[in-house]
Design a protein with these regions (language model features):
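Extracellular carbohydrate recognition and processing domains
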Residues: 104-134
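Exposed low-complexity, polar/acidic, P/S/T/G-rich flexible segments that act as propeptides
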Residues: 4, 150-173
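A short beta-strand element within beta-rich, extracytoplasmic domains
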Residues: 59-63, 67-88, 146
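Activation corresponds to long, low-complexity, non-globular regions
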Residues: 1-44
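Surface-exposed coil/turn segments at beta-strand junctions on protein surfaces, enriched
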Residues: 54-56, 70-74, 90, 117-119, ...
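Short beta-strands within extracellular/lumenal beta-sheet-rich domains
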Residues: 46-71, 125
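Noncatalytic modules at the cell exterior or secretory-pathway interfaces
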Residues: 131-149
Length: 173
């Protein structure tokens, strides 16, 4: 129950987004903040930097995040990330969003686009039976992988960072 404006509301799991419970950085480094900063869109960012290399085209940030579904059988599932790229022109750094399919034991690419240079929320909604993205053996775990890469630069190579403001799984039971 939550009190808001003198009224009491009963919240269901359909109203509460699944928040980050774990994070693993496969490539890159955390320069500021942490996973605790990702629970809401509040302009408090976790800053992720690619590990410096001699070849700027090999710069990458690769992160896996995990949460827990409110139900093992949600009717609908989505993944929302709010982020921005700092340090260069729009369009040079790509953001790929994958959700882990527990039936095939592999990640499914759901979105791939240039990351914005201002805070921008991207929501992906898988189609079909969304329970494939929920661990069915008791944990109700959700796993997403977000990869930021540079394929080529439109201008000169540059140093860049990613600021992530929010990562959640809004769901409907």
């Amino acid at each position: 129950m939550v009190e808001l404006g003198g009224q009491i509301f009963q919240l269901t799991s359909a109203m509460i987004p699944s928040l980050i419970e774990g994070q693993k950085l496969l490539d890159g480094m955390v320069a500021a903040g942490g996973a605790a900063d990702l629970d809401e869109s509040d302009d408090v960012h976790e800053q992720l930097d690619p590990v410096p290399t001699r070849n700027p085209l090999k710069q990458i940030v690769d992160v896996i995040v995990q949460g827990q579904a409110g139900s093992a059988t949600p009717a609908d599932l989505s993944f929302r990330i709010e982020s921005r790229m700092n340090g260069g022109p729009a369009g040079d750094v790509m953001q790929a969003i994958h959700l882990f399919n527990y039936q095939t034991n592999s990640f499914e690419l759901l979105d791939n686009q240039a990351v914005a240079i201002t805070d921008t929320a991207i929501t992906v909604r898988p189609t079909g039976d969304v329970t494939r993205f929920v661990q069915q053996t008791g944990t109700r775990e959700l796993t997403a992988r977000v990869i930021w890469t540079v394929d080529e630069f439109t201008g000169a190579a540059f140093d860049w960072t990613i600021d992530v403001d929010e990562i959640v799984w809004p769901e409907t039971d």
